[in-house]
Amino acid sequence: MIVAEFFENGGEIKGFKINGHAGYDDYGKDIACASVSSAVQMTVNAITDVFGFEADVSAQNNTVFFKTASGDIVLQKLYKAFIMQLELLSQEFNETIKIKFT
């Protein structure tokens, strides 16, 4: 299962950690994992490269960690769009993606 953990502080999303494997299909054929990976890459690139927000980012051993300091409204909307995409993927690929907030 892929676990998407979003970090909240004062009602704002400050980052996320994504880890695990969907187990929807064999490694290299898992479209659920590929879909989540694509959504993560697009979100990270939009936040850092397109909108220019600074972030702490690391990716290793099936885990992506991403954290920002800004509470900018644009950043919050980008996080919300990412959460919405993960929710849609969770509905499409039942029992493969869990979303939680801490």
Language model feature labels by segment:
Residues 1-31, 41, 45-102:
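N-terminal intrinsically disordered, cationic/polar leader segments
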Residues 32-36:
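Short, conserved glycine- and acidic-residue-centered signature motifs
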